[in-house]
């Protein structure tokens, strides 16, 4: 949860039951900033939304009280974290981890937002960027490639929090 270590590398070796999601865009992608977004059920009755808006961490994380604006104590006990955020241009990598004991009943949704082209709803720059998402879970690695469609928001997959079944969405839209 330390914001000063956002540029460090994250290992793909993780504990059983833990899921790591890694977003990557390359040097020649034409993109400067792509943001990871994960929503899911929190410890309370609502949903969390993990992402990094304008340099301020916005998520429910138990050890980051000072930057979790409006979070209740029970929401802060959700240990899902944005481990690495990259906002300094290409190439870039962002990492989200869901520890084994943090899974809640309900649907999780992972998306990537082309922040570079956020003002263009009909852009195809994201679709030709070569951006990938890799998911590591229980000794398996799954790779998702950005679809060839216009838009600046890529909804990659959903996860059932009870069964941990990942369902591919792979859809583009605009925000």
Regions found by a protein language model. Give the residues of each.
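Intrinsic-disorder/low-complexity signal
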Residues: 14-175
């Amino acid at each position: 949860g330390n914001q000063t270590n956002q540029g460090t590398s994250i290992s793909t070796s993780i504990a059983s039951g833990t899921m790591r999601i890694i977003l990557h865009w390359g040097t020649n992608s034409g993109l400067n900033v792509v943001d990871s977004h994960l929503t899911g059920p929190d410890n309370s009755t609502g949903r969390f939304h993990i992402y990094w808006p304008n340099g301020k961490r916005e998520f429910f994380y138990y050890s980051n009280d000072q930057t979790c604006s409006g979070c209740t104590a029970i929401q802060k006990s959700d240990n899902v974290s944005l481990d690495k955020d990259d906002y300094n241009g290409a190439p870039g990598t962002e990492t989200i981890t869901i520890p084994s004991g943090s899974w809640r009943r309900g649907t999780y949704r992972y998306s990537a937002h082309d922040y570079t082209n956020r003002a263009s709803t009909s852009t195809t720059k994201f679709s030709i960027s070569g951006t990938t998402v890799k998911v590591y879970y229980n000794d398996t690695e799954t790779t998702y490639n950005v679809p060839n469609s216009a838009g600046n928001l890529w909804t990659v997959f959903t996860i059932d929090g009870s069964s941990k079944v990942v369902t591919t969405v792979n859809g583009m839209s605009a925000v």
